[in-house]
């Protein structure tokens, strides 16, 4: 009788484990809009971490994967389970002594997704752009070995690219150059600098 009960509990535990396994990779979508509502970011979590950017009804950037590879082999963003979601509106007054205005307001909406394992990602949607950054709450030192940042454009847009003028030391330059006007598919595999 005792063996049957133990066997029954083992089978029940296995069924519960198998039944809940798909929940770990369940895809969940989060939406964040700019203050004026013109830009929208859709963040998807589950098997991976990706985002998509919309302007009105137009897709500007198709779902693009993001993540980090740590020195110990941990993949931040892979099988991402959100443990906390926080939203806030931000209006920062930025002093700009060398700009044509003395100061300006940087307004955005922010979505902070804390991920299981002591990491998180914060997205910001401004009226004229979108940004994200990873962070950690791990107390020990963390070494990032690589970053995954895909940019999947829905079509072959025209790009205005100012390439570096120093191929041997691409960051050792005056950051001044003419713009190469080209479809994204024809962009050169070398460093281009802002503004793009």
Where are these regions (language model features)?
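Bacterial N-terminal signal peptides that target proteins for export
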Residues: 1-11
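Intrinsic-disorder/low-complexity regions
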Residues: 2-3, 19, 35
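N-terminal accessory beta-strand-rich subdomains and adjacent acidic, glycine-rich linkers
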Residues: 27-196
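Sec/Tat signal peptide C-region and signal peptidase I cleavage site
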Residues: 20-24
